[in-house]
């Protein structure tokens, strides 16, 4: 049973921004403080300040040990998931720290949190009332065992553990625990809607092959870093499955980039390739690159693709709402030594990206005598006619 004394609680408040490693070395200075608990809570608060900002000022919230917190969702992705399903009843079969459950539960009249680790259940049972989530029932059980006997609900959520027995990260559905492919029929006998959070490294084709009742796919990125692959199962699967490519933004005025396509649309879409560059260069966000929506981008926006294997686009006029990074082209040159010297000799620092080019970023940076960073962006790529180009840009 977790208990935190008033002295330890005060210590946590007073040292909430301290370096936890330094504090651990000073444990003998504070004999009346439960230092392991204090360290866990202080570290948790510091991570939560970034991952779960709305909990930042809630001093009563308890946090788990680092591994569980490392694996949990961020608030921004949990809020997105909450938009995808509402109803009367929800069951989260892999409760964990409870972030996903706490945000998903706001759209349901009742919810059940299932977790086999007793300590995480204690933490969840303590935290949910503080978050005004008194309608969540906490069950300290194995999720698969609970699934066998549970009453039907509107929605089931699972976040299978993506670590193998040696502690390494895994990406195949069959290597996750529980194996949702084996449980698909049972899950859909208990709920009309099943939401599964998987590794963004999972191959989409493999996921669609293994999960026969997929209705939607959502690929979530945060600030252009791919974070989650969400698969929504239902009683029937449409002929063409919608793939939502979402980039959630915490900086700037734009909050979200969102493009929806199907694999069949991708095959049907027309794409214009180019031998020359316009005034602007576009790099699709991480979700679009993961999904392989290369033709669909060209169909949705008035852009030209540099080459079938160069996943960069160009246009003469500025396209403000393009779902990715936008750059103004300053100049371009071939990989010829003379041209490189004429166009790039003044550069000491630049952000270098390689797309469909015969050298690596490290090799190119070394050849150009550049350090990483600054306001200049260099894209080394290939045009449709096979010409190798280095494109010098500024971010819009």
Language-model regions, residue ranges each:
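SAM-dependent transferase fold signal centered on methyltransferase-like domains
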Residues: 1-396
């Amino acid at each position: 049973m977790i208990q935190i004394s008033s002295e330890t609680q005060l210590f946590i408040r007073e040292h909430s921004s301290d370096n936890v490693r330094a504090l651990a070395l000073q444990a003998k200075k504070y004999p009346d403080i439960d230092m392991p608990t204090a360290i866990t809570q202080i570290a948790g608060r510091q991570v939560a300040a970034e991952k779960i900002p709305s909990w930042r000022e809630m001093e009563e919230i308890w946090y788990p040990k680092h591994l569980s917190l490392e694996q949990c969702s961020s608030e921004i992705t949990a809020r997105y998931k909450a938009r995808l399903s509402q109803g009367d009843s929800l069951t989260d079969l892999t409760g964990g720290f409870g972030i996903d459950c706490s945000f998903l539960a706001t759209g349901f009249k009742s919810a059940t949190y299932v977790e086999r680790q007793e300590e995480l259940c204690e933490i969840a049972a303590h935290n949910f009332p503080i978050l005004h989530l008194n309608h969540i029932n906490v069950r300290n059980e194995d999720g698969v065992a609970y699934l066998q006997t549970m009453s039907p609900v509107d929605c089931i959520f699972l976040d299978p553990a993506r670590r193998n027995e040696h502690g390494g990260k895994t990406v195949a559905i069959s290597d996750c625990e529980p194996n949702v492919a084996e449980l698909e029929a049972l899950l859909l006998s208990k709920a009309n809607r099943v939401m599964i959070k998987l590794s963004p490294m999972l191959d989409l084709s493999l996921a669609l092959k293994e999960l026969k009742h997929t209705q939607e796919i959502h690929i979530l990125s945060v600030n252009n870093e791919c974070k989650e692959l969400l698969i929504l199962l239902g009683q029937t699967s449409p002929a063409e499955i919608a793939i939502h490519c979402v980039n959630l933004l915490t900086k700037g005025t734009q909050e979200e980039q969102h493009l929806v396509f199907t694999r069949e649309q991708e095959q049907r879409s027309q794409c214009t390739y180019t031998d020359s560059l316009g005034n602007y260069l576009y790099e699709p966000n991480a979700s679009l690159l993961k999904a392989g929506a290369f033709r669909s981008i060209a169909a949705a926006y008035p852009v030209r693709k540099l080459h079938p294997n160069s996943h960069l686009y160009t246009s003469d006029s500025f396209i403000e709402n393009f779902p990715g990074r936008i750059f103004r082209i300053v100049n371009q040159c071939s990989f010829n030594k003379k041209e490189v010297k004429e166009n790039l000799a003044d550069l000491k620092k630049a952000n270098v990206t390689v797309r469909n080019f015969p050298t690596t970023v490290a090799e190119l940076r070394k050849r150009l005598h550049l350090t990483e960073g600054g306001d200049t962006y260099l894209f080394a790529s290939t045009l449709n006619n096979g010409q190798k180009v280095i494109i010098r840009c500024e971010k819009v």
